[in-house]
Amino acid sequence: MFTLKKSLLLLFFLGTINLSLCEQERNAEEERRDEPDERNAEVEKRFFPIVGKLLSGLSGLLGK
């Protein structure tokens, strides 16, 4: 029983460290993304697929 508790405690400890490292990495990425160039690239990535779908839908309607 004692070995089971030790191994569970070790897994919990390692999982906590892993989550902490992931959170730090995510925060660093968010800080880098706050730069204006990155925000513009993000908007372009979201904007162009929507425009493409609209244009293809309109061309399909006009082609009929």
Swiss-Prot record:
**A Pfam family this chain is assigned to:** FSAP_sig_propep
Q: Which residues carry this modification: Leucine amide?
A: 62
- Stretch forming the signal peptide: 1-22
Cysteine disulfide partners in this protein: none
* Proregion span(s): 23-46
Family matches, as InterPro entries = Frog_antimicrobial_propeptide
One GO term of the cellular component aspect?
A: extracellular region
Q: What is its main location?
A: secreted
Indicate where this protein resides in the cell.
Secreted
Which tissues express it? Expressed by the skin glands.
GO biological process entries: defense response to bacterium; defense response to fungus; innate immune response; killing of cells of another organism
Query: At the top level of its lineage, which domain of life is listed?
Result: Eukaryota
> What keywords is this UniProt entry annotated with?
Amidation, Amphibian defense peptide, Antibiotic, Antimicrobial, Cleavage on pair of basic residues, Fungicide, Immunity, Innate immunity, Secreted, Signal
Write out the similarity annotation. Answer: Belongs to the frog skin active peptide (FSAP) family. Temporin subfamily.
Q: What is the documented function of this protein? A: Antimicrobial peptide with activity against Gram-positive and Gram-negative bacteria and against fungi. Has been tested against S.aureus (MIC=2.5 ug/mL), B.pumilus (MIC=5.0 ug/mL), B.cereus (MIC=30.0 ug/mL), E.coli (MIC=2.5 ug/mL), B.dysenteriae (MIC=5.0 ug/mL), A.cacoaceticus (MIC=30.0 ug/mL), P.aeruginosa (MIC=5.0 ug/mL) and C.albicans (MIC=2.5 ug/mL). Also shows a weak hemolytic activity.
Q: What is this protein called?
A: Temporin-ALf
Organism annotation? Amolops loloensis
